[in-house]
Each structure stands twice: as structure tokens, then as C-alpha cells.
């Protein structure tokens, strides 16, 4: 279980690195999805399964909407890939800065690889915290409705902003 949590942490850092050095929106969304899956898996291993599920749904839903709009606004005929030298240079530079920060901060020698999960037994150590669902919908229903209306308004604003001169954003092919 410790190695699994460390692997999720490594995937989270690599996903953030992929987002930071993304050459185009086509490839940046891969890093976002990797980072969100790894982060939610990390939360799941620590025992907060409901929060992990909600964050996973919000992150993936929001990221897919942002991905669609950024691809529609920045459609490049020849997008750069991760194998190009400029992108590899950014990635190597970010890793060098990360390692230098760890060395300067003195954290490189004191890294403790002991990860404690909820029960510290087995791979499926998920606490039953689904009592938060009832609290979320009973006490937070007002904010949930306000957030839903805000997201709907944002959707219509973005659709209005990206439409062409004579055609809307949703075109018939």
C-alpha cells in the first residue's frame, strides 16, 4: 500500500509537470487528467472516499469543458508535441528547479517514505464516510443551487463569447 501511495504521488507530480510544460491544449489535458486521477486516488487511499469522488467528478467535468473551449479557441494546424526540444527543455528545467528546491530546503535527506493510510491494512482501506452525503444535500442545498445556476450562466457567457460573426458556437455540420 505504501508503494501504491508513493506511485500515486509520483503520478500527481508528473501530471503537474505535464500541465506546466504543455505545448498545446491537446496535450495539456492529458496531464490534467493524470493529475486529477492520481490526486483523487491518493485521497481515496487516505480514507476520504466521498470527497475523492466529488473532486473527481468536478475536476473531470470542469477539465473537459475547459479542454473543449481551449481547443476551439486555439486550433493550431501543427501543434507541438512532448517530444519537441523546446518542450523537453521546459520539462527538464522544471525537474532541475524541483530538485534544487528540495536540496536547498534540506528535505532531500529527511524524506520519510512511510505512508500511513486509514487502517494500514490491505489495499482497500476505505473508511465509510458517506454520512457526508446527507450533510451535503441537507445543509448545503442552497449553495449547491447557487453554484449550479452560476455554472449555467458561465456556460452561456462562454458560448456567447466564442461564437463567430454570423454563426453560433454550436454549428450544424
Swiss-Prot record:
The chain crosses the membrane at residues 1-21, 27-47, 48-68, 85-105, 106-126, 139-159. It is found in: Mitochondrion membrane. GO terms for cellular component: mitochondrial membrane. Coiled coil: none annotated. Its EC number is 7.1.1.2. Its main location: mitochondrion. It holds the Pfam family Oxidored_q3. Disulfide bonds: none annotated. InterPro entries: ComplexI_Subunit6 (IPR050269), NADH_UbQ/plastoQ_OxRdtase_su6 (IPR001457), Nuo/plastoQ_OxRdtase_6_NuoJ (IPR042106). Core subunit of the mitochondrial membrane respiratory chain NADH dehydrogenase (Complex I) that is believed to belong to the minimal assembly required for catalysis. Complex I functions in the transfer of electrons from NADH to the respiratory chain. The immediate electron acceptor for the enzyme is believed to be ubiquinone. Belongs to the complex I subunit 6 family. This is NADH-ubiquinone oxidoreductase chain 6. The gene is MT-ND6.
Amino acid at each position: 500500500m505504501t508503494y501504491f501511495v508513493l506511485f500515486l504521488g509520483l503520478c500527481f507530480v508528473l501530471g503537474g509537470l505535464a500541465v506546466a510544460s504543455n505545448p498545446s491544449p491537446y496535450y495539456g489535458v492529458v496531464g490534467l487528467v493524470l493529475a486529477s486521477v492520481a490526486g483523487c486516488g491518493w485521497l481515496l487511499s487516505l480514507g476520504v472516499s466521498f470527497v475523492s469522488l466529488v473532486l473527481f467528478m468536478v475536476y473531470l467535468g470542469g477539465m473537459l469543458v475547459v479542454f473543449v473551449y481551449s481547443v476551439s479557441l486555439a486550433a493550431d494546424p501543427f501543434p507541438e508535441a512532448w517530444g519537441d526540444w523546446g518542450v523537453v527543455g521546459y520539462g527538464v528545467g522544471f525537474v532541475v528547479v524541483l530538485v534544487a528546491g528540495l536540496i536547498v530546503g534540506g528535505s532531500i535527506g529527511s524524506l520519510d517514505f512511510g505512508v500511513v493510510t486509514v487502517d494500514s491494512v490491505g489495499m482497500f482501506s476505505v473508511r465509510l464516510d458517506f454520512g457526508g452525503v446527507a450533510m451535503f444535500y441537507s445543509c448545503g442545498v442552497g449553495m449547491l443551487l447557487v453554484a449550479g445556476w452560476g455554472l449555467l450562466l458561465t456556460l452561456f457567457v462562454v458560448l456567447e463569447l466564442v461564437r463567430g460573426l454570423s454563426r453560433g458556437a454550436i454549428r450544424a455540420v
